[in-house]
UniProtKB/Swiss-Prot annotation:
This is Glutamate-1-semialdehyde 2,1-aminomutase. The modification N6-(pyridoxal phosphate)lysine is found at residue 267. GO terms for biological process: protoporphyrinogen IX biosynthetic process. PROSITE patterns: AA_TRANSFER_CLASS_3. The keyword Cytoplasm applies. HAMAP family: HemL_aminotrans_3.
Length: 427
């Protein structure tokens, strides 16, 4: 394939934008090539500025569960634009989407809309601190919760891709309030809680870790966190920015039947437009300004375009059999890629939860950040480039999740498996 215009645009972008991109992982650094510049997308396909067509498993990093440019969502957003893009004032649309989220997500009794997942997690932690009167938070190595200062300690996603566990610019005074445990290891959590008795405001966790690849929770892990938080008066926060409305309509908490105190959301609930949300028990959420003293605000929070896209997306997700069909497609492609690797004699460790999946370039099981970090990232980089040349667009990092959309056809999935088989044989 020819990528000459993308290469030219990347050179231009680096003169005006730090690193040439507006989010680090997009730079393709860890896969040893220049990024694609995208012109348009439709359904399961994405098209670059050189006219190349790709089957897309990035899906804008998760939001595009319906595929790109779903006609019903596009029509609704176009209609909303005619009424105004943003008012900085309440609208009925905010109530509609809030009520849909409350009905869907078991833990949410009240919800506040924001404009990004980072805002959601940052605000949820502030609220948990205000509710408990405690300063410390506990997170897990390899779990990414956005780029607010206190959460950039041993983070996943882009931070993992670039091998930077702690970002310069984060004061030590911030970091000292952040405790880090091992994902899927209750013993490490119990130890930290015991050492910091009555000091921890919240435990924040991705119930399905999606920012070090796709790492499911081990049996009893989420249940153990729930019990511990109840016993110790700690607010349990599920970061479902990625898994919310993705692994089930009610998110991972519905799938695993574990209810946190608070939940953060994003991605899918905005239908491809900038959005975030955090919600939980009324007794906690009522402490938010203006009803309480914990401050949070945003110019574009609850803007009518994102609310409209979210409402239409959630309506479509309620279609009978939607998640069963999506699960079938996801199982088909994930197991097909795993079989292709096995047939080629190339060792991978395959994981999947709903329509999130990952092919770890590892001979051993992956269940936490240490085991994920041991993967052969150089082999993955070669695999990524081979797949790209076959018209398959994957996330440009071993430490990211692949997403299946309802728009992926059986033909798309078969082409993906065939491309993987060819790539593994080359490796």
């Amino acid at each position: 394939m020819n990528y000459s215009r993308s290469e030219l645009l990347f050179q231009e972008a680096q003169k005006a934008i730090p690193g040439g991109v507006n989010s680090p992982v997009r730079a393709f650094k860890s896969v040893g090539t220049d990024p694609l510049f995208i012109e348009k997308a439709s359904g399961s396909r994405i098209y670059d500025v050189d006219g190349n067509e790709f089957i897309d498993y990035v899906g804008s990093w998760g939001p595009m569960i319906l595929g790109h440019c779903h006609p019903q969502v596009v029509a609704a957003v176009k209609s909303a634009v005619d009424n105004g893009c943003s008012f900085g004032a309440p609208t009925e649309l905010e109530i509609t989407l809030a009520e849909m989220v409350i009905e869907a997500v078991p833990s949410i009794e009240m919800v506040r809309m924001v404009s990004s997942g980072t805002e959601a997690t940052m605000s949820a932690i502030r609220l948990a601190r205000g509710y408990t009167g405690r300063d410390k938070i506990l997170k897990f190595s390899g779990c990414y919760h956005g780029h607010s200062d206190s959460l950039l300690v041993k983070a996943g996603s882009g931070a993992a891709t670039f091998g930077v566990p702690d970002s310069p610019g984060v004061p030590q005074d911030f970091a000292k309030h952040t405790l880090t445990a091992t994902y899927n290891d209750l013993e490490s959590v119990n130890k930290l809680v015991a050492e910091n008795k009555n000091q921890i405001s919240c435990i924040i966790v991705e119930p399905v870790a999606g920012n070090m690849g796709t790492v499911p929770p081990r049996e009893g892990f989420l249940e153990g966190l729930r019990s511990l938080c109840t016993e110790e008066g700690i607010v349990l926060i599920f970061d479902e920015v990625m898994s919310g409305f993705r692994v089930a309509y009610g998110g991972a908490q519905e799938l695993y039947n574990v209810t946190p105190d608070m939940t953060t959301l994003g991605k899918i609930i905005g239908g491809g437009l900038p959005v975030g949300a955090f919600g939980g028990k009324k007794e906690i959420m009522s402490l938010l300004s203006p009803s309480g003293g914990v401050y949070q605000a945003g110019t574009l929070s609850g803007n009518p375009l994102a609310m409209t896209a979210g409402i239409e997306t959630l309506k479509l997700l309620q279609t009978e059999g939607f998640y069963q069909d999506l699960d079938r497609k996801s199982d088909y492609v994930a197991s097909g890629i795993a079989k292709a690797a096995k047939d080629a004699g190339f060792p991978i460790y395959s994981t999947r939860v709903g329509s999130m999946f990952c092919a770890f370039f590892s001979k051993k099981p992956v269940y936490d950040w240490t085991s994920a970090a041991a993967c052969d990232t150089k082999a993955f980089a070669k695999y990524f480039r081979l797949m790209l040349d076959e018209g398959i667009y994957l996330a440009p990092s071993q430490f990211e999740t692949a997403f299946v959309s309802i728009a992926h056809s059986t033909d798309d999935l078969d082409k993906t498996i065939a491309a993987a088989a060819k790539a593994f044989k080359s490796l």
